[in-house]
Amino acid sequence: MALLQIAEPGQSAAPHQHRLAVGIDLGTTNSLVAAVRSGVANTLPDEDSQHSLPSVVRYTQDSVLVGREAEAFSAQDPQNTIVSIKRFMGRSLEDIQSGDQTLPYIFEASENGLPIFVTPSGKVNPVQISSEILKPLVARAELTLGGTLEGVVITVPAYFDDAQRQGTKDAASLTGVKVLRLLNEPTAAAIAYGLDSGQEGVIAVYDLGGGTFDISILRLNKGVFEVLATGGDSALGGDDFDHMLQAYFAEQWQVSSASASMNRKMQIEARRVKEALTESAETTASVVDDAGTKLTLTVTRELFDSLIAKLVKKTISSCRRALRDAGVSNDEVLETVMVGGSTRVPLVRQEVESFMGKTPLTSIDPDRVVAIGAAIQADILVGNKPESDLLLLDVIPLSLGIETMGGLVEKVVSRNTTIPVARAQEFTTFKDGQTAMAFHVVQGERELVADCRSLARFTLKGIPPLAAGAAHIRVTFQVDADGLLSVTAMEKSTGVQASIQVKPSFGLSDEEIGSMLKDSMANAKEDITRRMLAEKQVEAARVLESLNAALSKDSDLLSVDERGVIEANMASLAQIASEDDADAIEAAIEVLDTATQDFAAKRMDNSIRLALKGQSVDNI
């Protein structure tokens, strides 16, 4: 939907004026920029007629090289030539260094544990490096279109978490360009194909790029793109195919401890071999080692298929899980859209066709389709197509909620809820006179906080010191169109509030999400039992807390024997509540309730007597 432009009174908003906006596919291996010109969306080439820009940045003492210029030095200066920066976005240095791949870069950890690259130009972080890739794309667009951009739509993998999405926005901010929206890559592809074909029904978008894999199941209906379910892996892509070949080269050539330069040479050759085998059944790998010896090796497509078979099967498993989440079968999928350069690999297409039961769509260049979809969306958002009723409804992959007493999870936004979304729920205080409340935001499907993923914590202060349960705190979860989560807590009588924008530092891979969902199903019965126990334990604690306060205030209303009976039942409840029997706790609460009924009546009578003291009958 278009962003409305409002003019001052007496000034024209120039509705006929075409506003400049582009879509950018900020990829792991290559990046592209696209625009709608004369009603047609296409990628914009550079002065050398190259549409893609390698996502490579090289730092020297006095310059920063980007794209092919930087890529040319990747073998001779791998330490300062940074590739696949998208893989580093939002990940901790510890996580990066614990991976299987040996990285040639010099790292330092920032205060929050995120990676800092030490280069001849100084210390830089992934956000700054990403901005260097965006700069020439923006410059290319403005030169080609002949003006300043009013905004861009940048695509991101569906499983980028909040920190990764915010980092992408920050990178764009460093270039001085306005981000109209972050758009999930599969959704962008659906826009490109949906507008071209005009189909309605269920479509699968299989997106295998250089560094990430996403599968999205979408329903197209009267211009509405609804993502029914998503899946994928933020650390699986064509780069991993290259790594399998690279490891095979090292084994065959008996390269046990290769230098960074040799590793980079093998990596480049692995990519070339992969691309050659897309068209040919056989090719020869050739690398000159550090000693000047030329190493060669014949590689067949059959061998390559055997090396990558497990990785391709992982993507099919994600497809199967996404279909199950969406509640649709293979037969209901009208088309499968192929996105990403890695979908050119014959084995990938064969496995997808075999699983889906139909030939996948490849009519739009899989390398360009995401950028084209982003350009179409940018054209709409900037107001060039105000009549367009295109809607995008992405979904939340895992439920969002907060911790309540007893370590329980209260889900506020359920998984597979379409975004943008806002949900609110009311909570109250546990203790008399409570003036603050701590909030713990979690993600997951389990019933207990210990089994879910922690996202953020914040505290609401300034709650009026009322009796337990008297204060009303409204908690609102808002997830915007870019998938960023904001949580706000407000005390209703005073209006005092606190909020937090959730920016977790770590993303979730497809395996982790799948594992969390599998665990929730496998432990559903046990989780409900544990939840019921925790709820009864919380209720017991509340009863004992309330009764202790009452005894402290009005114990003089009881005889020694009456108080002894109550305290004995309280001790019994406290003992039973520490054990794992919800039914026994409930029974003990009922026994204590019966034992305190006379005490409650005496307190009520006493309160009425005190309230009426000194009042005449006429006043009453």
Swiss-Prot record:
GO terms for biological process: iron-sulfur cluster assembly. The keyword Nucleotide-binding applies. Keywords: ATP-binding, Chaperone, Nucleotide-binding. SUPFAM superfamilies: Actin-like ATPase domain (SSF53067), Heat shock protein 70kD (HSP70), C-terminal subdomain (SSF100934), Heat shock protein 70kD (HSP70), peptide-binding domain (SSF100920). Pfam families: HSP70. The keyword ATP-binding applies. GO terms for molecular function: ATP binding; ATP hydrolysis activity; ATP-dependent protein folding chaperone; unfolded protein binding. HAMAP family: HscA. Chaperone involved in the maturation of iron-sulfur cluster-containing proteins. Has a low intrinsic ATPase activity which is markedly stimulated by HscB. Belongs to the heat shock protein 70 family. This is Chaperone protein HscA homolog. The lineage of its organism: Bacteria, Pseudomonadati, Pseudomonadota, Gammaproteobacteria, Alteromonadales.
